Amino acid sequence: MNLPQIFVEQMKEILGPELPEYLESYEKPKFTGLRVNTSKISVEEFERISPFKTLRRVPWTPNGYYYTEEDAPTKHPYYYAGLYYIQEPSAMTPASVLPIEEGERVLDLCAAPGGKATELGAKLNHTGLLVANDASASRTKALLKNLEVFGLPNILVTSEMGDKLDRYFHEYFDKILIDAPCSGEGMF
């Protein structure tokens, strides 16, 4: 894999002699996953109608599955109907472990492109309020698209810095998810 040189240099500083082993990991097959939209379909019903042959459960989330590229889930009508979201399995963890109860007011501070926000919204089960925020206005287009496809009506999308949101919503939320923006290295 041809990684950006600046990234390799940064990783060399961090990893030192372990860098070659780390770089080799980029040549191994990656894990790919999808997460069922439980606001539209139950996990059991999805398993019953799923055309995908290679699905395996992601052990740390009840509605996550590994798949292989031969299944091509992004080309299936179920994807466009919002029955599932394509999400790297480790990225399923934050929203999966945050205990959300129906009727709560929840903030996803760094929400784009919407993977975690769609899970939080599904856990609210059309109750309460989810404020899906991303400081980058350009990233909210993908966020809006994903939330719309998921059919979640109780969501407010904002594009503000966290300190400004605090002025408007001070002590308002029952739960806050901050999966702070990363470098995008997971996309390599």
Where do the language-model regions lie?
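S-adenosylmethionine
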Residues: M1-F188
